[in-house]
């Protein structure tokens, strides 16, 4: 039911949602629900293990019946697939991933505590974003060469430790997962942005996106740079173009775009109207 309500809210009511005065609190509540319900309760944390197992099964002519053994996760995969067509990777990575939600909530706590933030320069940000594709390529190669070790290779994801076992594993695994959560408190969603192989796969799947769903104006990027500066994912170019492969659908830029008190082009247009009326 939650997924059924979330999809139309993001698809047809995103401007209303982004413009709501309590949107940050609403988003935090949704992320907390995803973490608790989809993650801890439903065990619906998607993993790179599934697509790797599909690759191995197709190579060996095996059955894909294992996909229906977990209906809850299959439903989340289906929602992510719909997201590919409508928004790109953003639906899953920004809203439906329990570990992503955990990192986002950890960041919110860090900001409340006023912890110092360490963000890479734009040059290093672009470089680091390529790492996740290298990790994905290595995992795919591993699945083809040694399919029996897929689960071992996939430990690069902290999902099993953090979500599936609630951090109750041998200390190296727990420390690894806690390290990524801790890093997200000083470097915004570092695992998601730079290392996550599932995120890389989602970005590739997002190439199926059928539309540019984020509204833009001619002044976006030239001269206005507000959305680019505010985008914590680094998904907006200096030209104002949205890099949908790095967009997590946080809707912050939609909020700015539609707000006459924040959007610089709207502010300037209002001032011109005032001068004409004077």
Question: Where would I find each of the regions flagged by the language model?
Answer:
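Non-ligating segments of multi-cofactor redox enzymes
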Residues: 1-239, 245-246, 252-278
